[in-house]
From Swiss-Prot:
<keyword id="KW-0963">Cytoplasm</keyword>
<feature type="region of interest" description="Flexible loop">
    <location>
        <begin position="99"/>
        <end position="109"/>
    </location>
</feature>
<feature type="binding site" description="in other chain">
    <location>
        <begin position="230"/>
        <end position="231"/>
    </location>
    <ligand>
        <name>ATP</name>
    </ligand>
</feature>
<comment type="pathway">
    <text>Amino-acid biosynthesis; S-adenosyl-L-methionine biosynthesis; S-adenosyl-L-methionine from L-methionine: step 1/1.</text>
</comment>
<dbReference type="InterPro" id="IPR022629">
    <property type="entry name" value="S-AdoMet_synt_central"/>
</dbReference>
<dbReference type="Pfam" id="PF00438">
    <property type="entry name" value="S-AdoMet_synt_N"/>
</dbReference>
<feature type="binding site" description="in other chain">
    <location>
        <position position="56"/>
    </location>
    <ligand>
        <name>L-methionine</name>
    </ligand>
</feature>
<dbReference type="GO" id="GO:0005524">
    <property type="term" value="F:ATP binding"/>
</dbReference>
<comment type="similarity">
    <text>Belongs to the AdoMet synthase family.</text>
</comment>
<keyword id="KW-0554">One-carbon metabolism</keyword>
<keyword id="KW-0479">Metal-binding</keyword>
<feature type="binding site" description="in other chain">
    <location>
        <begin position="164"/>
        <end position="166"/>
    </location>
    <ligand>
        <name>ATP</name>
    </ligand>
</feature>
<keyword id="KW-0547">Nucleotide-binding</keyword>
<dbReference type="Pfam" id="PF02773">
    <property type="entry name" value="S-AdoMet_synt_C"/>
</dbReference>
<keyword id="KW-0460">Magnesium</keyword>
<dbReference type="InterPro" id="IPR022636">
    <property type="entry name" value="S-AdoMet_synthetase_sfam"/>
</dbReference>
<dbReference type="InterPro" id="IPR022631">
    <property type="entry name" value="ADOMET_SYNTHASE_CS"/>
</dbReference>
Amino acid sequence: MSSYLFTSESVSEGHPDKIADQISDAVLDEILKQDPKARVACETYVKTGMALVGGEITTSAWVDIEYIARQVICDIGYTSSEMGFDGHSCAVLNGIGKQSSDINQGVDRDDPLNQGAGDQGIMFGYATNETEVLMPAAITYAHRLMERQAWVRKNGTLPWLRPDAKSQVTLKYENNKIVGVDAVVLSTQHSDSVTQEDLHEAVMEEIIKPVLPAKWLSKDTKYFINPTGRFVIGGPMGDCGLTGRKIIVDTYGGAARHGGGAFSGKDPSKVDRSAAYAARYVAKNIVAAGLADRCEIQLSYAIGVAEPTSIMVETFGTGKVADELLVALVREHFDLRPYGLIKMLDLIKPIYRETAAYGHFGREQFPWEKTDRAAELKAAAGL
């Protein structure tokens, strides 16, 4: 019997890197509302008392960068100087320029279908049937712990919680099936008023137990709640935050490969983002169709070229048909040119700020999570 452990982590919406991601995507959303053809690459840096928003943006829109950044920071919950970061009073610096005309000429075309990729690169998408949302379980539950932390913080259940937090879930597998939770790590920022004893009990009862399946918890499960003790100094006061530094948290928690490109702050002409969403969409529909228990898709692009330079399908021995047939089905049923996938997934809409915390995948409100191609794929495969 093969037995192994697998671990994934998540971070809260108040983690410094996630503050940066959310500001970048909030700027993108506001621009797309006015100018769907905008070219946006927005990067954010946050540290004690300041947020710097920079990057390259070409658009006919005008947006109030300072207002957007402050609104995001306050929405997250940083509204007091006692936390070391206050959206009302922090400095907001603007360092935005325009996208290179050399890139524009390679991307824009008279016929939108021939729109070139905004850059070269490799992108991966993944799906597995070990959860109902066809995502790896460890990252799914790590995200849910962070969502629960924010919920009990904001609704007043645990008013002494603060926005910065991290989670980590270690699952035990036997014969590739989950048999239990081996360990849970949850570190959360808190006010100075709460005792460690009260914090440990509250986190266990209000965050961990409501989220993790009871059947996976046992006397052998290990819990590490704020294992260093005090966590009063957090957020940008404790660490600087940068857009694009949580790419594994954003995707599959290490259960699948990653091409290296971050998502937040990028408009959908950037295949780092849009093709990664399309690869998830393809992989999820293959698994939903019952053509494999696990599926990983790799796509690659050349700057200024519309057609992908490669498509790979890997089903890790779980495929019901040959991987080569799946590649042919992908080419036949999915338009993976930049404009094709933007149209297929309706990516021009201002939906991106919501993606910037708790993972881009496994959340059914996003269009790349639809399984509307599963039936046609199953029929085309002859199953």
